[in-house]
Amino acid sequence: MLTRLREIVEKVASAPRLNEALNILVTDICLAMDTEVCSVYLADHDRRCYYLMATRGLKKPRGRTVTLAFDEGIVGLVGRLAEPINLADAQKHPSFKYIPSVKEERFRAFLGVPIIQRRQLLGVLVVQQRELRQYDESEESFLVTLATQMAAILSQSQLTALFGQYRQTRIRALPAAPGVAIAEGWQDATLPLMEQVYQASTLDPALERERLTGALEEAANEFRRYSKRFAAGAQKETAAIFDLYSHLLSDTRLRRELFAEVDKGSVAEWAVKTVIEKFAEQFAALSDNYLKERAGDLRALGQRLLFHLDDANQGPNAWPERFILVADELSATTLAELPQDRLVGVVVRDGAANSHAAIMVRALGIPTVMGADIQPSVLHRRTLIVDGYRGELLVDPEPVLLQEYQRLISEEIELSRLAEDDVNLPAQLKSGERIKVMLNAGLSPEHEEKLGSRIDGIGLYRTEIPFMLQSGFPSEEEQVAQYQGMLQMFNDKPVTLRTLDVGADKQLPYMPISEENPCLGWRGIRITLDQPEIFLIQVRAMLRANAATGNLNILLPMVTSLDEVDEARRLIERAGREVEEMIGYEIPKPRIGIMLEVPSMVFMLPHLAKRVDFISVGTNDLTQYILAVDRNNTRVANIYDSLHPAMLRALAMIAREAEIHGIDLRLCGEMAGDPMCVAILIGLGYRHLSMNGRSVARAKYLLRRIDYAEAENLAQRSLEAQLATEVRHQVAAFMERRGMGGLIRGGL
């Protein structure tokens, strides 16, 4: 038992979060002691009560907390006496307190030991069993020893922080989708949790194979159904997410390992948990953003499989009339199941700004915050305000604050209406300068076509999306059809196709790349120049697709040096000759440019001018590389800021050099459509802004209400700032003076 005890302590100590540590503890104690129930009650001395924080065997109700006063129940008695209590039949003890919601009436044997550190009671550790018996001395000694070890791992500061969640009223988080929402918080009690699945075996593997097969089929049908549903509307980005889910679900290796686990004697639920977690951990251990997000996708798949394995979850859910979803994690499938006419906001404990769930809430226009460090159960059925602009969550707000946010929501609705009135007008400054508003495309062609009259062309088409949704490299013919559709859709406007940009944040399932530091590794143009056959096939497809329209711009991603540009141009010229030989006539020459996202190229602009026709500044990666920060890492995401003075000075230098050397300058990335950044970019000299479709209306509204001189003045003052907060204060004041403060916060 000593070895087992050491293993449990090491696993608990290495858990990244207290809740995870407690779940590991109760699970491993049940396995080690061969007992049916293990629970941890932690003491909140401010409220003089215990919280049931983790259990295996009892029914811990979703969406609310289970508490016991210090003077209640046998658990309370263990704490008051500060010594173990070992009972053969706990229900006959005068201190026994029945709690219907946890379903413990089946269990008779009870052993509870206090968790004490430096004379301070931290909690009570309990095991229970149906059998009428006292736990023997070795079992009691084992549990007492574990409680002592737990006391050393736990600290009062940890518990104070944990229980502080129940009293928090304002919680900082990451803004994931703009907007303001007010409603009751709601945790979905029907969603199965992976941590609630425990190891269990079966004597009928054939039955478990049948159950697993059924769950896989149900999930596949579900993903196809959601894909068709969203494809039928304007949400093509969302449809593409479910296509990717279907692709992951059909992975041969994943299915093989699931059935292998069942064949070893595991029940289907345990097979799903072990295999999905193994795959997800492999992805999560890698450092690049895209692979980390795929770990979340795999867990979402696992959750859906567990859902379809549980017959009890197949009934309808009683959603409130208006609610804000609160969850530990969020999947696109969960969002798709929710009644869209009732869902007004989302709060997620874990999540990245570029996860599929984040993409989807932005596409649906649902105000969302992620990285809110609070348990969802604490927020269930409480009045919440989600501020997706500031990245704030307000819990049980005072009436005055509630009234103020309700006013902001009304004004936000009016502002959206005003912006839509301008969307079909040209993006022209008050001083007369014409700004080109371009579209970042690649996920939703039908929706993009609807924006055709509102934009000046496609500033960035992400060609990697079709590559990611297939089980192998698309053929040249398939690519021709794909690109032809986009070039013809906007045949009177420039269309910029970016060559394959994979690696690091975007991986192909059939071309896995494992590196210690993938963000600085084999990605973008580095891959396609090392694999010229991939590059040549893609460029030939682009040139063939452009033969009839002549509006093609080719964009090279992740360029680090001039020799990469030279080699890429050489291959493009070769592809052009091959296409002309194939079709027998001369084809239009495309314009060739680079995505400026690596800091080294900022200093090479005079030499680039002789090699490229245009430059498109990719602000997302350029910000990350200049600041050396991963914006999807919640620990450092607050450092990521495109308005950092160093970033602004880099943008100013790029604009200045581009003007001197006559380079056609463009900008894409989140800055291009961010109302907090647009005026500064205009003042710095940027005239081509490429943004996501949802940003077009508000960007045009802003542009038509400023003139160049005042934008230039704002940009110059921002360049003199020393901190990003100074810049933001300047922009906020600038916007408020012009009656456009509502574009950067709630309200008008």
From Swiss-Prot:
This is Phosphoenolpyruvate-dependent phosphotransferase system. Component of the phosphoenolpyruvate-dependent nitrogen-metabolic phosphotransferase system (nitrogen-metabolic PTS), that seems to be involved in regulating nitrogen metabolism. Enzyme I-Ntr transfers the phosphoryl group from phosphoenolpyruvate (PEP) to the phosphoryl carrier protein (NPr). Could function in the transcriptional regulation of sigma-54 dependent operons in conjunction with the NPr (PtsO) and EIIA-Ntr (PtsN) proteins. Enzyme I-Ntr is specific for NPr. It comes from Escherichia coli (strain K12). The EI N-terminal domain contains the HPr binding site, the central domain the pyrophosphate/phosphate carrier histidine, and the C-terminal domain the pyruvate binding site. Residues 128-170 are annotated as: Linker. Belongs to the PEP-utilizing enzyme family. Phosphoenolpyruvate binds at residues 462, 498, 620-621, 631. The active site is at 356 (tele-phosphohistidine intermediate), 668 (proton donor). Optimum pH is 8. Coiled coil: none annotated. Residues 171-748 are annotated as: PTS EI. It catalyses: L-histidyl-[protein] + phosphoenolpyruvate = N(pros)-phospho-L-histidyl-[protein] + pyruvate. Its cofactor is Mg(2+). It is found in: Cytoplasm. One of its GO terms (biological process) is N-acetylglucosamine transport. NCBIfam families: PRK11061.1 (NF008283), PTS_I_fam (TIGR01417). Mn(2+) allows activity only at low concentrations. In the presence of low concentrations of Co(2+) or Ni(2+), activity could be measured, but at concentrations above 0.2 mM, strong inhibition is observed. InterPro entries: GAF, GAF-like_dom_sf, PEP-util_enz_mobile_dom, PEP-utilizing_PTS_enzyme, PEP_util_AS, PEP_util_C, PEP_util_CS, Phosphohistidine_dom_sf. Keywords: Cytoplasm, Kinase, Magnesium, Metal-binding, Phosphotransferase system, Sugar transport, Transferase, Transport. Residues 1-127 form the GAF domain. One of its GO terms (cellular component) is cytoplasm. Mg(2+) binds at residues 597, 621.
